[in-house]
Amino acid sequence: MFDLFEPERRAINQLLVGLRDEIIKKDASVRGFNIGMNSGDAAGQTVDHAHVHLMPRRQGDVPDPRGGVRGVIPAKAAY
């Protein structure tokens, strides 16, 4: 994200908003989203290009949604 030009950042934001609207339209059970992007080796980036994860969330899909996506797969939460 930090290496992108402003028009690219705006395009990503527009894409995320459009995808959000499309997902909610198709699935009314979606109540929120996690948006993820790793930037740099220390942050866990494993591919050498910008990419964004948009994860639809539903009420009660995990016991406690605090902490974001780390708790979605309990066996993988502590890493």
Residue ranges and their predicted role:
Residues 1-79:
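HIT superfamily nucleotide-processing domains
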